[in-house]
From Swiss-Prot:
It is found in: Cytoplasm. GO terms for cellular component: cytoplasm. Keywords: Amino-acid biosynthesis, Cytoplasm, Histidine biosynthesis, Lyase. The gene is hisB. This is Imidazoleglycerol-phosphate dehydratase. It catalyses: D-erythro-1-(imidazol-4-yl)glycerol 3-phosphate = 3-(imidazol-4-yl)-2-oxopropyl phosphate + H2O.
Length: 195
């Protein structure tokens, strides 16, 4: 069973994450940050990872700690659910169009975290959500998930469309990477013998 539950509590936030890598994309994400919940819902639905996230944060300051700490906890949950990564495809990629926007994602569940982020969100906010937090989420998620993650915006004029295309592209790439590869059996997908 490729599932994990992570709880993270600090003076700034209280986060709980439950995921099932072999799900159907069911979700119940309640972080208190509306646009972010919408993006997490996209991540779950398009990766087919069942995801339940509950978060409480220091909203009186801003949404930064809530978004970043959710990325940390979700990355930790992904890493825990993958275990030693036997039999997974490991790599995933997607070109995702959404109206004016197109975002490309390539990722490797290598255990070597690195984020390449070439995304330009033209507005500072989407509603009340600070657009710079999109990168902050993916930085935390990739670091704590052990993911080499490249996200490149190829086109886009509307910040909402660009951000949503990024989340969906990562989701579709993640869906490929976490899938079990029947040709690999229980082999670790590396010549090193470990990831």
């Amino acid at each position: 069973m490729r599932r994990a539950s992570i709880s993270r509590q600090t003076a700034e936030t209280e986060i709980s994450v439950d995921i099932n890598l072999d799900g159907t994309g069911a979700y119940d994400n309640q972080t208190g940050v509306g646009f972010f919940d919408h993006m997490l819902d996209q991540l779950a639905r398009h990766s087919l990872i069942d995801m339940t996230i509950s978060a409480k944060g220091d909203y009186h300051i801003d949404d930064h700690h809530t978004v970043e700490d959710t990325g940390i906890a979700l990355g930790q949950a992904l890493s825990a659910a993958l275990g030693d990564k036997r039999g997974i495809r490991r790599y995933g990629e997607c070109h995702l169009p959404m109206d004016d926007a197109q975002v490309r994602c390539a990722l490797d569940l290598s255990g070597r975290p690195f984020l390449v982020w070439n995304v330009d969100l033209p507005t500072a906010k989407i509603g009340t959500f600070d657009t710079e937090l999109v990168r902050e989420f993916f930085q935390a998620f990739s670091t704590h998930g052990g993911i080499t993650l490249h996200v490149d915006q190829l086109h886009g004029l509307n910040s909402h469309h660009i951000a949503e295309a990024a989340f969906k592209a990562v989701a579709r790439a993640l869906r490929q990477a976490v899938e079990s590869d029947p040709r690999k059996g229980d082999a670790i997908p590396s010549t090193k013998g470990t990831l």
